């Protein structure tokens, strides 16, 4: 399974994370999330991709940002989404990558 580090297209041109506008880049988002949550434990979980939808925003260590980054492609491009949210002092980062038309998924 190949998952693009730079999704071909994003639902929005920019994504706000940790109080700063960031390019919609999966790897950058994951790195930023880890830096912003270094006082929390992180879990990476595989999830099934669903229709693109906004999940609102979350506050992590006093920093507010969206808890969803989603991208889409065409043909065999990899479509990826990232969830970041806090619950009971636990931060969950879930990454889903799949080939369009396939049920295969993998986690980063």
Curated annotation (Swiss-Prot):
This is Putative uncharacterized protein OPI6. Disruption phenotype: Deletion leads to overproduction and excretion of inositol into the growth medium. Partially overlaps PMT1. Disruption phenotypes caused by deletion of this gene may also be a result of a defect in its overlapping gene. It comes from Saccharomyces cerevisiae (strain ATCC 204508 / S288c) (Baker's yeast). The gene is OPI6. The lineage of its organism: Eukaryota, Fungi, Dikarya, Ascomycota, Saccharomycotina.
């Amino acid at each position: 399974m190949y998952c693009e580090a730079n999704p071909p297209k994003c639902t929005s041109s920019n994504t706000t994370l940790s109080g700063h506008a960031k390019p919609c880049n999966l790897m950058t988002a994951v790195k930023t999330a880890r830096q912003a949550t270094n006082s929390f434990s992180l879990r990476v979980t595989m999830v099934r991709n669903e229709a693109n939808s906004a999940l609102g925003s979350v506050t992590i260590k006093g920093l507010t940002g969206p808890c969803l980054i989603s991208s889409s492609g065409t043909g065999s491009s990899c479509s990826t989404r990232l969830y970041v949210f806090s619950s009971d002092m636990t931060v969950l980062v879930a990454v889903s990558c799949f080939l369009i038309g396939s049920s295969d998924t993998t986690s980063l």
